[in-house]
Amino acid sequence: MSDLHGHLPNPEQIEKVDVVVICGDIVPLKIQRASMFVDEWLRNEFKEWIQLLPCERVILTPGNHDFYFHSAPRTKLEDTLNHVGKKLVYLEDSSYIYKGVSFYGCPWCTGPLGWAFCPGNSMLFHGVYKEIVTIEDMYNKIPECDVLLTHQPPSIENLGTSFHWDKARAKDWGSDRLRVHLKDKNILVNFSGHVHSGDHERILYPTLGCDTVFYNVSIKNEQYKVAFQPRYILLNKEDKTIIEMGTTKMITLD
């Protein structure tokens, strides 16, 4: 799932799985720029939710609304993550292997200046003011892996197309450069979010020169209302197959 923006789905309505993946924008909108309140939220509501989820691991990469993860000094961030507990695995340009399945998380996005994990602007990055490197530098770090978590989707068909209220306003917010970097890479599945109203169906893109399966797993729409259910898949690493176990069909809005 992705783009929770503070909404924590009822754990009793989540099916039992091995791993839950979250592709960013978890922090409530109303406090997203208030580090003290975000830290408190992570240590309390978020921690309790993580512990109640019916899974063994929760693997998270942040998004452009998650300013706390971008700006907090690394020692502070590590302390907060340790407080949440070992069940949560935080991936920021880093890898993790669970039961032989490799995961990599890339939070970086192409986008306007002033947002978290958007290169090209001078801002507080883990407690130090610095000029953020280019998006290519961050994409170059992406290795071959079984499961790739990116906040922004690659520009592939309508995966990152925002339709808002009508197709006349459609715009592709996917990353062309991410699509180029994924070309010919051996990645089984790429989960992303960022664009709430992007195509949530299974997408294949054979012209990319790979067999990667792409999913937009945001759970909110462009009006920040819960609109999609979590996506469930069964990944069989031995024969490189992905079986869909559930859908993200539109649900009744609040």
Model-derived features with residue positions:
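Active-site neighborhood of phospho(di)ester-bond hydrolases with catalytic His/Asp-centered motifs
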Residues: M1-S2, V20-D25, R57-N64, Y90-D93, ...
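Active-site environment of divalent metal-dependent phosphoester hydrolases
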Residues: H5-N10, V27-I31, N64-A72, S95-I97, ...
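Core catalytic region of metal-dependent phosphoesterases/phosphodiesterases
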Residues: G6-Y98, G174
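Short, electropositive alpha-helical surface patch
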Residues: A72-Y90, A168, D172, I203-E222
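Binuclear metal-dependent phosphoesterase catalytic core
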Residues: I97-K99, V180-K185, H196-D254
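Binuclear metal-dependent hydrolase catalytic cores centered on His/Asp/Glu-rich metal-binding motifs
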Residues: V101-V147, K167-R177
